[in-house]
Amino acid sequence: MFKKLTLTLAAFCAAGIFAAEKAAIAYPGYSLEADKGGLVIKDGSGSRLLKIGRQLFSWAPPVAYPETVTQIAPDTLKVDYRIDKDKSGQVALSATFRATPEGTIFADYELTAPEGMKTGGIMQELQPIGVKKLPELFKSGLWTRDDNGGVPYEVRDGYFRGFQGKRASVWLQLGGNANYTSSWAEHLSYKKNESGKQSASCVFQLTPPGTTGAEAAALLRNRPLTLTLATGKPFNLWDSGVPEFTVNITNPGSQTQSGVELAVTARDYDGRSVLNEKRLLTLAPHQSETLKFQLPEAERMIWFAEASVKQGGKELLFTRTSLAVLPPHEFQDRENSRFGMSAYFPVPDMESVYKLMRRIGVRILRHGDNRECAKYGLLALDHANVPKAQDPSKDKARLDQILKRAMEFENPEIEFCNEWNMGLKPEFHRKYAERYAKLLRQFRQLCKERNSDIRIIGMGIAGDDPKFVRALAAAGAWEYFDGGIAMHPGRGNFTPDYEKNQWSYLGSIRRFKKVMGELGEKSIHLSEVYAATHANDWWKDSERQAAENVVLTYALGLAEGVASIQFYQLHDAVWHDIGGVNHKDSEYSYGLLRRDGAVKPSLLAYAAVAEQLDGAKFRKYLTFNDLHVKGVGFDTPRGPLAVVYDRTDGMVQSKKAPDFIHLEPWVDHWKTHREVTLPAISDEVTVIDSIGRATQVKAVDGKVTLTLSGAPLMVYGLQF
């Protein structure tokens, strides 16, 4: 707290800015001063915290050294840099640093560089002196209401790097690629400006020691409060008992916040309001309040919680999460399971992730280390890519690297390369198919030399793409696919049983199988199947649609006899931005879990369908007198299982529209719900919904009446 630094915001504002003999900006709580080789940030006692030094071009020879520091305004320093290793003689760099009484320092850089010089890798030297650089970024997302009334979503608020000290800390709002980092530098992203030069920026924030990332983000963004929901449980998941969560509200600033209206609500999957509480709070400077809330006990359920804050009747901010109960379950036929996971991240940690995947019924991993994951009953394959346009002289080293890892990780099969056909024009099919076949021959020879019996799964084909698949066979690749071939049946705004569109799930599988019949049967691995939940995107699922579509994805995949069905992916976000947020990019929304690991309905659906298809054998597709009723029949150790649903409302989930919105996950989106009478083999049938909740329905005279919609039900006790 700034009080601990012997100042408050009021003291800040009352203090005058002064310039020392050397260029400096000083406030009672901190100062920014010229220092040999750059600028230094000091705390109120004069202790050095962080030095801002050189800029290294990294991808080009020049290095920029701070040479002169000039005070151009009471609150602004200008730095001019000396450029070394500049053969062009055309590189120039200057920067301004504006420091405010609130502890914020705005750094703006302007670069002149000749055309062709690589400036994309420039790193700003930041030397921790009286602070320790935190290893984890704080990736701030700001929950936002949709202008059209759709579901709320997170917007990227900024990524923040912390430098924690005993008496003060410094937080940096990154101005570049968060992955370009080291113990002493951070990346700056230079972009061309209107003058033809290049600009970059970043922002520093002085804070009290112990300030969290959320509090630092609020200070940098001039928000008076922070608001977080937490459970302390991995994935916000319970196996029994009463779920509970905390709401933390903090005033990170130096002014009292009064009249703070806190509202906390929660709904279950059926739309019932199970929590609706309000508090009126006053928060002194740096005060934090944590409130605890409980949800009803349930055997299996998911809830959606929201906390919001208003002042003067205006909403300042809100946040959301989801919580669930998923009871324990042991799978009986794990060895033969075809349920897989295409990608996953260590959020919150790998042990928790492995345990979760075991619980929900995952058997096959697209990649992983069997020395670790085998302990959890998981079988890791390998997946590796060689860029299709890579310089062939680099192929041998890359192939050697791929095989070495697969042997070390004890992977029995490897999916060799990925989606070379994506966006590939037909006239290039032959060229790259022949390159791929050559790589396969090289890789197989390398396997022989290393005494490796690893099987090759042909590259994951984007969609069914029969022309490219035929080109692979013509080039001689087919004989090497002793592990089968992979395919990614991308699915648009259709239910999984739709067949007509190129980007339809069942349609892609059946078209792919037809090509297999022409070229020679190979086992098919669906190494990426999808139920993305990009908010208010007409091409993607809502969270409720995703849960329903996960059930059908696996039921239909098993019915079609594929070797594995690997869901893409466990977590939201992307591999190069784990835990990140980017509302503009749908790639961040493919998970069964939210970016922070919180459970989505689709995770419960994955567990539900895995439980019911444990040990199942496909019997037949079901037909009924009512042509709108569809079904898939399986024999299971628990008896005959029918996955049934109604298609009165069709298979197209949405229409393209600029103002398209998704419904909330607790809202049933099907227009038609019909009572349908079906033949039964017992006096009672068991009906299991998309998230795994079971109910018993009485049958009379060998018939049972079920209420059907487009949402699939898994039913034991039907005659077929």
Give names to the regions the model predicted:
Residues 55-116, 184, 207-213:
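Extended, loop-rich substrate-binding clefts of extracytoplasmic carbohydrate-active enzymes
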